[in-house]
């Protein structure tokens, strides 16, 4: 019996992506990132859904072509049902349902956040994946959480942000600095030439493992406004130091809670996932903890950090193996709990 070939489709925000997987190995992973939102300083939902409609067919076609797969060879179709922007999700969901119906193959819904975590089980991403149980710090523009992963689909959120996500904080602070959207990668790059101890910003004090990032943003805003009154060129003259200091503050905040969870639970299998897991400072601090605290760490390949269909296909394969299929009458949902 031939190994199943799964097509994965991702459209939760502003990335239209399709991927093909077989035996946990990615045969193709194509993405079209929408740049139209840059001028607006954030994702515009209506524009995003329209762009998905234009992009989804060519992206899927390119994914199949790169994998050297014909449509009739597809065993099942996995798609992001949520969470995310409803209009964007509906495009991917409708396309996946239509294609599954026309090919008479199973449809498999995928939770976008679970997919970020389970991307660690893609073979080419990590030939030696995490052992259960493990902790995963999942950080993106829309979510920040610490997840206790007991099994593939046995996950518990033990800590999460009560306001802004870490990626959202990077973007909002980037706007204060006059940087383009999305600002996370720009701040990371500028921080390479800056002093992370140049400026000190307020850090939230919360019990347990929960996060808060809105206070950091406010602290930066008030500090910059005060300095600009003294020197109108303050941001331009200190941009690298500002970026390095902000990055250190956010990463320290992320790691403090993760370190607490590791200590309290006694679990030293530790992973990171999501778009912010591409941040160089976060990766460096994770590596430092591996060396000093004896953590066994798992850091995703860069192509699996941002929204991508490879992780959707990975989860779909796991569900296919378990015989967990989705009714064709299903629809997308902007909120989708584990």
Residue ranges with predicted function:
Residues 189-270, 279-293, 320-323:
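A contiguous, well-structured pocket-lining segment that forms one wall/lid of small-molecule binding clefts
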